[in-house]
A protein has these predicted regions:
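Short, hydrophobic secondary-structure boundary micro-motifs
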Residues: 47, 120-122, 135, 156
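Helix-turn-helix
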Residues: 2, 29, 37-75
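Short, Lys/Arg-enriched anionic-surface-contact patches
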Residues: 17-30
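Hydrophobic alpha-helical connector segments
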Residues: 75, 89-124, 128, 138
């Protein structure tokens, strides 16, 4: 296994001293305000009027940008995806797939670090509301297909669906450690991710065998329900996938 370099503590970018920060577009103001509110209250308790007031926009502007609260989460996730995809490390190209994926997911966690409180809030809401958890899972799978691609791991076809769903569940388990990891270097989170990827290799191999010999059944099983191995993984790593 290649030696992993020490990772710098994640930080929000700061404007130059003495210079006013650039004005955010209305859409970005709303996303930022929504995640600030999530740090204070549950997803289901946030009202449109409170959100518009926190963002400093009118209700008409809020409605123009977003039709409901879930698309705000989706927009945030897309922004995180883009940040991770833009930060690729060419030096990782020759590393094994597991190491490349570890690097990609750690970059994702570093990008998420300023919003730990909001993510913790969303995780709690997903546990209380199965329909919300299901919606989050759809976002998570889409996002993790991009993360697999960033790690140069095939994410196309039925096998890609399997990999993305498995990775979404694995990452949800890691997030449970991440939201309570107070170390700036995310040492506990790195260890949790390392263990999760090790455990996930067995599960991934079992389902990839299914895809190899019966690709139609592979895709349909993801729609109809989980196999016993998937339920075991859920029990070990978390009840739901969170789209981060």
């Amino acid at each position: 296994m290649a030696r992993r370099p020490a990772r710098r503590p994640p930080q929000r970018p700061r404007p130059d001293d003495g210079a006013p920060p650039p004005a955010l577009p209305d859409r970005d103001k709303i996303i930022e305000a929504f995640f600030a509110l999530l740090a204070e209250q549950a997803f289901e308790d946030i009202g449109y009027a409170d959100l518009a007031a926190r963002a400093g926009v009118s209700l008409a502007t809020l409605r123009r940008e977003f039709g409901s609260k879930l698309p705000i989460v989706a927009a945030y996730v897309k922004a995180i995806d883009r940040k991770v995809l833009a930060g690729g490390d060419a030096d990782m190209a020759d590393e094994p797939p597991r190491e490349r994926l570890f690097d990609v997911l750690m970059r994702r966690l570093e990008a998420l670090a300023p919003d730990k409180a909001a993510i913790r809030s969303l995780m709690r809401s997903a546990r209380r509301h199965p329909s919300l958890a299901l919606a989050f899972n759809g976002l998570a799978v889409k996002s993790q297909r991009w993360m697999l691609t960033a790690a140069n791991i095939d994410a196309a076809g039925p096998r890609g669906i399997v990999r993305a769903q498995g990775l979404a569940l694995l990452f949800a388990g890691v997030l449970r450690t991440f939201v309570d990891d107070e170390d700036e270097g995310l040492a506990r989170t790195m260890a949790a991710l390392d263990r999760a990827l090790s455990r996930g290799q067995r599960w991934s191999s079992l389902l990839e065998d299914l895809c190899r010999f019966a690709p139609g059944r592979c895709a349909s099983r993801l729609c109809r329900g989980r196999r016993r191995d998937e339920r075991d993984l859920d029990r070990d790593l978390g009840e739901e996938a969170i789209p981060f």
